[in-house]
Design a protein with these regions (language model features):
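Post-signal peptide N-terminal segment of secreted/secretory-pathway proteins
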Residues: 61-144
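Immediate post-signal-peptide N-terminus of mature secreted/exported proteins
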Residues: 24-81, 150, 184-208, 212-215, ...
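Short, charged/polar, low-complexity loop and linker segments
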Residues: 69-71, 95-109, 138-151, 183, ...
Length: 336
C-alpha cells in the first residue's frame, strides 16, 4: 500500500476555549494571569486556524483513500467490481475563507502566510475534485470504461507534489503554534489550581508523545511490526499510565470537581475512551514484540486499519476519540 508521505496523523487538535468570559482587564482588577491574557489575545486567530488545519487533514484523508483505490502510479489502477472513493474535501467555502484571510488588512503572521500559500494549488484542485466526486458518485465509469478516470487521475497527480509541499509547511507552523498554546493552557491551569484539568492535559500530552513517536518511526499497518521500536514505546507508555493514574485519583476529589465546574461522573466517558486508547497502545506494543502482522485488509486499506486493534492507525483513531471527549469537557467547563 502506498501512502501520501510516511503516515497521516488524522487527529483533532485540542480546541482552545477562552479561560474566562468577558473582557480582559488588568490583573490588579480581574486577577487575569499573563497566560490568560495571551490565550485570550490568540483565541480567535487560533480557533480559525484549527478549522483550517482540520480541513487540510480531511483533504489528506480523502486523498489517502482515493490513492489506495486508484494507485499512485501514472496509470490509473482499474479495479473491477469495486467502488472507488473520491470524496476529497476541497470546496469553495474553504477557499473563500482563505481568500478572506488573504484580502484582510490585518497584519499577517507566519501562520497566516503559510495558509494563504495553499490557495493557488487548492484553487487548481477544486474543479478536478468536484468533477471526480460527480464522476464516481454517479458511476459514470461504467459508461466510459474508466476513460475519464485516467484523465482525472493524471490531473490530480500533477497537483500532488505542490499540495504536499505547501500543506506540510502550514501544518509544521500550526503544530508549533499549537504546542505553544497548549503549554500556556497547562501553565494557566496549574497556576489557578485547576488540578483536574491540568492532570487531564498532562495525560493527553503523554499520549501525544506516543502519536509523535509513531510518526517519527514512520509506522503504518504494513510495516509496524518489522520497523517499530517497542522499547521506546514502552517507556512512553509508562509515562502515560502514570499520568492517567494521577488524573484518575484527582477526579475522586469531589470538592475539587466542584471548584472546577464539574459534577461527579462528568469524566466517565473520557475515562472510557482513555482506557480504550491505552489498551490499543498496549496491544500495539505487544504486536511489535511478537511480530504479529496486521491483516491483509488493514494493510491494503487504512479504513480497515483504523478498526483493527493495535495497528498504528487504530492507536491514532482511539487518540482522536480521547481528544473529542476532552474538548466536550472543556466546552462544558467554559459554559459554567
Amino acid at each position: 500500500m502506498k501512502k501520501i508521505g510516511i503516515i497521516l496523523i488524522i487527529m483533532l487538535v485540542i480546541v482552545f476555549l477562552s479561560t474566562r468570559t468577558g473582557k480582559i482587564e488588568k490583573k490588579s482588577l480581574s486577577g487575569v494571569s499573563k497566560e490568560q491574557a495571551v490565550l485570550e489575545k490568540n483565541k480567535d486567530k487560533y480557533n480559525k486556524h484549527i478549522r483550517f488545519y482540520n480541513r487540510i487533514l480531511n483533504i489528506d484523508k480523502g486523498l489517502l483513500y482515493y490513492f489506495e483505490d486508484a494507485g499512485m502510479d501514472k496509470k490509473f489502477k482499474n479495479i473491477q467490481n469495486e467502488e472507488i472513493t473520491a470524496d476529497i474535501a476541497i470546496d469553495k467555502n474553504f477557499i473563500d475563507k482563505l481568500k478572506e484571510l488573504s484580502e484582510s488588512k490585518e497584519k499577517k503572521d507566519e501562520l497566516d502566510k503559510k495558509a494563504i500559500a495553499m490557495l493557488p494549488v487548492l484553487e487548481k484542485m477544486l474543479p478536478i475534485t468536484d468533477e471526480m466526486r460527480t464522476y464516481y458518485k454517479n458511476k459514470q465509469y461504467l459508461q466510459d470504461n474508466y476513460a475519464k478516470a485516467q484523465d482525472l487521475h493524471t490531473q490530480l497527480l500533477a497537483t500532488l507534489d505542490k499540495y504536499n509541499q505547501v500543506t506540510k509547511s502550514y501544518k509544521e507552523v500550526f503544530e508549533k503554534k499549537s504546542d505553544e498554546i497548549k503549554k500556556l493552557m497547562i501553565k494557566d491551569y496549574d497556576k489557578r489550581k485547576q488540578y483536574i484539568t491540568y492532570n487531564q492535559f498532562m495525560f493527553i500530552e503523554e499520549g501525544d508523545q506516543i502519536i509523535k513517536e509513531i510518526h517519527k518511526q514512520g509506522l503504518d499497518a504494513s510495516d509496524f511490526t518489522a520497523k517499530g521500536n517497542a522499547k521506546k514505546f514502552k517507556k512512553l507508555e509508562e509515562k502515560m499510565d502514570k499520568a492517567f493514574i494521577k488524573f484518575e485519583k484527582s477526579i475522586k476529589n469531589t470538592k475539587q470537581l466542584g471548584k472546577e465546574g464539574y459534577n461527579p461522573g462528568d469524566h466517565s466517558e473520557f475515562i472510557q475512551k482513555a482506557n480504550k486508547f491505552r489498551q490499543s497502545v498496549n496491544v500495539f506494543i505487544q504486536r511489535i514484540e511478537k511480530k504479529e502482522k496486521a491483516s491483509h485488509s488493514s494493510v491494503s486499506d487504512s479504513f480497515f486499519a483504523q478498526t483493527e486493534e493495535g495497528t498504528p492507525e487504530n492507536v491514532l483513531a482511539n487518540f482522536n476519540e480521547v481528544i473529542k471527549e476532552h474538548n466536550k469537557l472543556l466546552a462544558k467547563k467554559t459554559k459554567k
